[in-house]
Regions:
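Active-site PLP attachment segment
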Residues: 5-50
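Glycine- and other small-residue-rich loops at beta-strand/loop junctions that grip anionic moieties
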Residues: 16, 63, 165
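Short acidic/glycine-enriched loop/turn segments that link adjacent beta-strands
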Residues: 21, 119-121, 156-158
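PLP-dependent aminotransferase class I/II
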Residues: 42-82, 99
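Conserved PLP-dependent catalytic core of the aminotransferase class-I/II
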Residues: 69-113
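Conserved PLP-binding catalytic core of the aspartate aminotransferase-like
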Residues: 94-98, 107-144
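PLP-dependent enzyme catalytic core of the Aspartate aminotransferase-like
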Residues: 133, 139-193
Length: 193
């Protein structure tokens, strides 16, 4: 309940962790701050000739051709998560992330960016890697090993990030580990000091 939480602003993308369709994101703005927030794109609700009870809602109203079905899935996703004890599912996912983090760091001769605790590790882990060609590495993982995973440059570093959802298992992480190990042995894409 965001109003009882007392948040000024709160936004969430629900498509990954709540398994709703892409585009199902929400924005909550405390009434005290609604006048300060203008939409990036305006549509028919902006300066409407027939305003509703809320100029904030009017200003953020989207075009009539927008498909709202993704947003309408959010309540059912919350119901699904409650029904299937998603707190326990998420905890098991975090445990799987944490139990593999050091193994991957050792493989690429790296260190975790933060302590391996629930305060820092949710359902994903970014492994600092040394590569001069992150795009080629990402493409190789996909083309040869059929693994879709972010290989992301950030500043002067590159990160390989895995994430775990309810449908992932240790076998998936073993497949990734074996692929990275093979790439280290057969290419010069990942540098090991």
């Amino acid at each position: 309940n965001l109003s009882s939480l007392g948040a000024d602003l709160f936004t969430g993308a629900c498509h990954k962790w709540m398994m709703t369709p892409k585009g199902s994101t929400f924005l909550y703005v405390n009434k005290a701050f609604q006048r300060m927030l203008d939409p990036l794109v305006i549509s028919w609700g902006f300066n409407s000739t027939t305003p509703s009870h809320s100029s904030f809602l009017d200003y953020h109203q989207t075009q009539g051709t927008r498909d709202f079905s993704a947003f309408l899935c959010i309540p059912k996703a919350i119901e699904f998560m409650n029904q299937y004890n998603w707190t326990a599912v998420s905890s098991a996912c975090r445990d799987l992330v944490k139990s593999n983090a050091l193994r991957f760091c050792e493989l690429v001769n790296s260190q975790p960016l933060a302590p391996l605790t629930d305060d820092f590790i949710l359902q994903l882990f970014s492994i600092p890697i040394k590569t001069k060609n992150p795009i080629q590495l990402k493409n190789l993982l996909f083309d040869q090993y059929k693994i879709e995973i972010p290989v992301m440059p950030h500043g002067d570093q590159v990160f390989l990030r895995y994430s775990i959802q309810a449908f992932n298992t240790q076998a998936h992480l073993d497949t990734l580990y074996d692929a990275v190990s093979d790439i280290i042995k057969t290419t010069n894409l990942i540098e090991i000091d």
